């Protein structure tokens, strides 16, 4: 009986680690790799990339399964330098924003994309959007809305793209970690001709983070974006960026963790618990 009680308590605790947590600010940030390159400076969370130290990556909060995730940041400049904000599951499901410096118009191209089980359908599931201001000049609010029925990608609260579960048989729907990374894509058609290291350091600068959990599911409407490339003008204007810089900056630094995130509950854990009970 005691073993069963312990099992149920452990099961409940492990399962609760999967639940999305409402977050505002930087206190739930976990450095995924390259700790020295992630720094809290003047009220901003800055992620660095240099030739000697490489890029950096963070995870925000616990894993999520449906919610609205907003990160306000200024992307880095530079050929081959990719600033990315995305949801990533262990089975390869992925939903992302990527600021690609070599696509169409350098420093003004946003890519939205999704991948199912790691299948690399890059040109099928990707959409590109051109802004009228360089992405490295201003802080923009990037939002991913995830419901059981659809994903939405938003820029400064304006809808860029929507993918419905009913429009594809490769809809990513696995509990995922929330990540931001800055990295060198290496020379090539997607990333660019190569990094000009005379421009370093390259910085992805974050001014705000907000996570809202479990929005009500609604019936999806058809995709509003019908072309591969769309030009954005008014939505990128500084006057519409309400979260450009926090107005209540203080010298107190948030608690940023430098540990690996706890993995979601999986069936191997359940099997080990059952083995413990009955053996």
Role assignments for model-derived ranges:
Residues 136-152, 156:
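Localized edge beta-strand/strand-to-loop motifs within extracellular or lumenal beta-rich domains
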Residues 118-139:
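Short, aromatic/His-centered strand-loop micro-motif at the edge of beta-sheets
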Residues 255-279:
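Cleavable C-terminal sorting propeptides in eukaryotic secreted/cell-surface proteins
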Residues 24-43, 96, 100:
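Extracellular glycan-recognition surfaces and repeat-rich motifs
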Residues 59-67, 130-137, 170-171:
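Extracellular/lumenal carbohydrate-interaction signature centered on repeated Trp-anchored short motifs
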Residues 9-20, 275-279:
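N-terminal signal peptide
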Residues 152-210, 214-218, 222-225, 230-232, ...:
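Aromatic sugar-binding interfaces of carbohydrate-active proteins
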Residues 47-111:
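Secretory/extracellular carbohydrate-interaction modules
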């Amino acid at each position: 009986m005691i073993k069963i009680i312990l099992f149920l308590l452990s099961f409940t605790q492990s399962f609760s680690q999967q639940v999305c947590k409402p977050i505002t600010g930087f206190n739930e940030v976990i450095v995924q790799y390259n700790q020295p390159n992630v720094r809290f400076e003047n009220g901003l969370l800055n992620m660095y990339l240099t030739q000697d130290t490489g890029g950096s990556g963070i995870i925000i909060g616990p894993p999520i399964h449906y919610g609205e995730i907003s990160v306000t940041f200024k992307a880095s400049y530079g050929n081959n330098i990719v600033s990315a904000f995305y949801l990533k599951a262990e089975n390869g499901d992925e939903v992302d924003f990527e600021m690609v410096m070599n696509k169409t118009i350098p420093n003004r191209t946003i890519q939205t994309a999704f991948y199912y089980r790691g299948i690399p359908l890059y040109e099928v599931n990707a959409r590109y959007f051109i802004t009228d201001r360089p992405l490295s000049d201003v802080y923009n609010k990037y939002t991913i809305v995830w419901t059981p029925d659809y994903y939405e990608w938003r820029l400064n609260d304006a809808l860029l793209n929507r993918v419905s579960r009913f429009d594809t048989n490769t809809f990513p729907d696995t509990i995922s970690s929330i990540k931001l990374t800055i990295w060198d894509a290496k020379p090539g058609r997607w990333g660019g001709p190569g990094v000009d290291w005379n421009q370093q350091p390259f910085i992805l600068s974050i001014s705000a983070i907000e996570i809202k959990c479990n929005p009500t599911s609604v019936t999806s409407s058809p995709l509003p974006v019908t072309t591969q490339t769309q030009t954005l003008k008014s939505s990128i204007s500084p006057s519409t960026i309400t979260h450009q810089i926090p107005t209540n900056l203080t010298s107190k630094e948030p608690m940023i963790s430098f540990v690996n995130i706890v993995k979601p509950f999986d069936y191997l854990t359940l099997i080990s618990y059952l083995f413990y009970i009955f053996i």
